[in-house]
């Protein structure tokens, strides 16, 4: 079978569809272009959407660690008054509260999420402890002690209509936005989980440069017109 793409090295910017895993998109791309050397600059949870930076070919995948360390920007929605075990909409509900925070209380609590903060990775995450991913322990009902990590964040409240709290956030590598929503809910005394998440920027690559990830499902789709170099220029 003739492959749809002739140019097989470069950076492909994808707007990840909701409900798809990041690795399912990588597998689809591998099948589409016949190149096994494909990396990324950060995954997204299945419920999340937005910028995924795909690195195609050895020349580009070797710099994945550099791109992984770049800052990211998100638009997010927290659901107040309810908590889940995974801190997001895919988890099991473990608590509810009738408290309705005021906008002033929310603004005051949000000031904590400015600059350098300490964060503990959620149990439902791919962070490894003793050689196992945390979600492997969580699925067995186990809670493992996790080390705090230091991250840089800048959070801005953009809209509030209870129970939904919209915010934007710029953050450093390794920041769990689910944990931000969870911690904010705890500070407000009502609990919260992350309802929606959209990555708007990864390093210098933005959402308006991305193609719809669903296009990768088309067997004759040619990605070559959309491949970029490290500076974001078209190849």
Swiss-Prot record:
Active site (UniProt): 45 (nucleophile)
EC id: 5.4.99.25
InterPro entries attached to this UniProt entry: PsdUridine_synth_cat_dom_sf (IPR020103), PsdUridine_synth_N (IPR002501), tRNA_psdUridine_synth_TruB (IPR014780), TruB_C (IPR032819)
Single GO BP term: mRNA pseudouridine synthesis
Gene Ontology molecular function: RNA binding; tRNA pseudouridine(55) synthase activity
Name of the top EC class for this enzyme: isomerase
Substrates-to-products reaction catalysed: uridine(55) in tRNA = pseudouridine(55) in tRNA
Keywords, alphabetical: Isomerase, tRNA processing
Family to which the UniProt record says this protein belongs: Belongs to the pseudouridine synthase TruB family. Type 1 subfamily.
The protein's role, per its UniProt record: Responsible for synthesis of pseudouridine from uracil-55 in the psi GC loop of transfer RNAs.
Protein name: tRNA pseudouridine synthase B
Native source organism of the sequence: Chlamydia abortus (strain DSM 27085 / S26/3) (Chlamydophila abortus)
Gene for this chain: truB
């Amino acid at each position: 079978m003739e492959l749809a793409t002739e140019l097989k090295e470069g950076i492909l910017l994808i707007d990840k569809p909701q409900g798809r895993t990041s690795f399912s998109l990588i597998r689809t791309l591998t099948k589409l272009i016949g190149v096994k050397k494909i990396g990324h600059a950060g995954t997204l949870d299945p419920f999340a959407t937005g910028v995924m930076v795909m690195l195609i070919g050895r020349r580009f995948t070797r710099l994945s660690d550099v791109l992984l360390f770049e800052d990211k920007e998100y638009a997010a929605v927290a659901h107040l008054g309810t908590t889940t075990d995974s801190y997001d909409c895919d988890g099991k509900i473990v608590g509810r509260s009738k408290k309705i925070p005021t906008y002033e209380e929310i603004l005051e609590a949000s000031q904590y999420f400015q600059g350098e903060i300490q964060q503990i990775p959620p149990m439902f995450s791919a962070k490894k402890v003793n050689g196992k991913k945390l979600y492997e322990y969580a699925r067995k009902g186990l809670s493992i002690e996790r080390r705090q990590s230091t991250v840089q964040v800048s959070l801005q409240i953009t809209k509030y209509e209870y129970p939904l709290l919209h915010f934007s956030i710029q953050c450093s590598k390794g920041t769990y936005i689910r944990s931000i929503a969870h911690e904010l809910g705890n500070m407000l005394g009502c609990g919260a989980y992350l309802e929606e998440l959209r990555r708007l920027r990864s390093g210098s690559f933005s959402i308006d440069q991305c193609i719809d990830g669903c296009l990768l499902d088309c067997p004759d789709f040619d990605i070559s017109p959309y491949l970029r170099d490290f500076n974001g220029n078209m190849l």
